[in-house]
């Protein structure tokens, strides 16, 4: 198995600081939020998986922002549906 190097991921993002932010956000999605990895896990930790995804061009700041906006929209839609159900006297 080839080792992931930070330089490979930096080339995809543009600079080390943004790469660190993107990798941390993606690793948190995988570890805490239960998002599925876009690459084979191979017993790697979430940070290594995130770096591999960045290296392959599967993840960047824009894709993370879009995913986050979609998650917020889904959460808001569920909340609106719950409030509507309560207002109509239905239970979920």
From Swiss-Prot:
GO cellular component, one term: DNA-directed RNA polymerase complex
EC number: 2.7.7.6
Single Gene Ontology BP annotation: DNA-templated transcription
Keyword line: DNA-directed RNA polymerase, Nucleotidyltransferase, Transcription, Transferase
Catalytic activity reported: RNA(n) + a ribonucleoside 5'-triphosphate = RNA(n+1) + diphosphate
TM region(s), chain numbering: none
GO terms assigned for molecular function: DNA binding; DNA-directed RNA polymerase activity
Root EC class: transferase
Domain of life: Bacteria
Function according to Swiss-Prot or TrEMBL: Promotes RNA polymerase assembly. Latches the N- and C-terminal regions of the beta' subunit thereby facilitating its interaction with the beta and alpha subunits.
Family in the record: Belongs to the RNA polymerase subunit omega family.
UniProt xrefs under NCBIfam families: rpoZ
Protein name: DNA-directed RNA polymerase subunit omega
Native organism taxonomy: Bacteria, Pseudomonadati, Pseudomonadota, Gammaproteobacteria, Alteromonadales
């Amino acid at each position: 198995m080839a080792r992931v190097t930070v330089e490979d991921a930096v080339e995809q993002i543009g600079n080390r600081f943004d790469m660190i932010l993107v990798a941390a956000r993606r690793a948190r999605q995988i570890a805490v939020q239960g998002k599925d990895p876009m690459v084979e896990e191979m017993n790697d930790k979430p940070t290594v998986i995130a770096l591999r995804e960045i290296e392959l061009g599967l993840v960047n700041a824009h894709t993370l922002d879009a995913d986050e906006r979609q998650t917020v929209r889904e959460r808001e839609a569920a909340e609106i549906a719950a409030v509507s159900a309560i207002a109509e006297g239905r239970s979920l």
